[in-house]
């Protein structure tokens, strides 16, 4: 559905050129909810704006639904953008228009008849759960309600792709959850491809099928959400998954070696592994960190253990006897 090939973007600044994107290549399949996550300044918003040519890349190719955007005429690009809509952090509603007129606006620009536009707008207000707000003004709505109106407006032209640039960053956690559930429901009902730009791991965990981690304008890691967040392989991924630094805690390498265990289903997360190591093998481990989380609607657990050097091989052999537990040795950080 969306294919980015070797995208680079350079901005001119007073001090010289700044590389915002460096050879980024991604493929997003039709109907996916795809997350792009990274710290501030990683290049996330620049990347999503390249997907509809709000930002033109310095080099590289952007393909959407089998068409290369940069080779389109101005008229063809306008038509293509009706199928690649976008919502933002700050809603961008027209404050002097009612909610109904806000949703009608893109249809008016497309030349749709007024009666047809209003009928479609009312259907969309129903779809996003606000049929009673047609005559209300944006200032009369909560932040979550304003974002629902923005989503309805984005769907007005029956797009194939919905780009969400930090769409929940200005919302409280409960409202964020509600908006994410709405986006997922629309994805399932309409088959629309969704790209989520965020710096919040919780957003990606809740809604996305796949994720790419951006770091310094480059793709540090990508794949299924469950695989990337259960066992991040890149330094950028580890910073996101272990924001408190649990992955970098120092233990004495002369005394113990560390392993990360990934429990890949709800049954294995319930195994009292450390207790069994102590009871059955007389091996006493240092639990550095442990967590259980839901990723892509499945339960995963992770544990970082310090195992005495003298018993390391025997402990790893014992753990590997359990199915669905992945064992990975972790280097010490100084």
What are these regions (language model features)?
Residues 52:
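Helix-to-loop junction immediately C-terminal to a conserved catalytic motif
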Residues 222-223, 231:
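ABC ATPase "signature
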Residues 136-139, 157, 164:
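Conserved signature/switch motifs of ABC ATPase nucleotide-binding domains
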Residues 97-104:
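Short coil-to-helix segment of the ABC ATPase nucleotide-binding domain corresponding to the Q-loop/switch region
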Residues 67-68, 104, 108, 115-132:
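Conserved ABC ATPase "signature" region
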Residues 173-175:
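Helix N-cap at the start of a conserved alpha-helix in ABC-type nucleotide-binding domains
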Residues 13-18, 69-85, 109, 114, ...:
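ABC ATPase NBD coupling module
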